[in-house]
Amino acid sequence: MGTRWFAKNTTMSKNSIVIGVDLDGVCADFYGRMRQIASEWFERPIDELPEEVSWGLSEWGITNPSQYDSLHRFAVTQRELFSSMEAIPGARKYLRQLSDEGFRIRIITHRLFIHYFHATAVQQTVNWLDSHGIPYWDLCFVKEKTQVGADIYIEDSPENVAQLRGRGLFTICFGNSTNRHIEELRAASWQDVYDMIKAFVT
């Protein structure tokens, strides 16, 4: 199955290729910022919260979805999570390079999950993208990422990677501790992402 995602596409022109880019965990350091906020939320020294986590953050003492939702809601509404994350190294550089080469960058994120907070979530997202110099052609707020019609996807969520690949879509898994079980293609850095995209279209 791993080699399936190395197959080259010889029918695409760079100027027509849309790259669907996840935001949290791919462009923005979601887990790094959440760790800071969780330290405050649980009133625990940050050194007690491991940097290496699994999906659901059980390593920080979260035992059920309700606890995760409470922490996440606090992070978003009270600590401006969407506008306070650091950029993942290389995201700005290589997305700008891909954009300059004619690829269309489509940012795809599922952030409209808190009722009556949509306008703020959108504004924080746009402000973050602009302040970090992340280029994009489109910005899509959607849960089902297969619906956005990209040619290449960069994603870190194990569920989303499986769903996209299940539809036969070329998907690069941006590696972190939550998705180590996911097969190739895997990128350990944004330079890896860039090299994989170039290999796919060359």
Swiss-Prot record:
Coiled coil: none annotated. Its cofactor is Mg(2+). Mg(2+) binds at residues 22, 24, 156. One of its GO terms (biological process) is pyrimidine deoxyribonucleotide catabolic process. Keywords: Hydrolase, Magnesium, Metal-binding. The keyword ATP-binding does not apply. Its EC number is 3.1.3.-. This is Putative 5'(3')-deoxyribonucleotidase. Belongs to the 5'(3')-deoxyribonucleotidase family. It comes from the Bacteria. The keyword Metal-binding applies.
